[in-house]
Amino acid sequence: MEYSLAVKRHFAAPKRARELPAGSSGLVAGEAEDRSLHVWVRFQLQIVDETIAAAGFQAFGCPHTVAAASVVADWAEGRPIAEVRKLDVKTVCAELEIPVEKLGKLLRVEDALVACCRS
């Protein structure tokens, strides 16, 4: 499989691939997985005054999954939680030039973010 330059960049040096400090005020977490697709994603968000003050992620999966989680975490930081809740992973697919057949894996990225926003 050939990967876009953006996927290669995010996979080689993912942005915000980190665990946020335990006990931080406003810290929420959410995760999603699909063992049949070999994918697991976990986001942590620190929410201060309805805004994402910090975002971090952990991911297991193919380069597309890791790159998408990197883009989403980077995009979310600094945005209002209401805006983050409206993320459409298809936009991330287009930005990273990810083939539509990988959408099932990327939906787990969206599911993890939604779970985080519900916390």
Which role does the model predict for each range below?
Residues 1-119:
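Domain-level signature for proteins that mediate thiol-based redox and metal-cofactor handling
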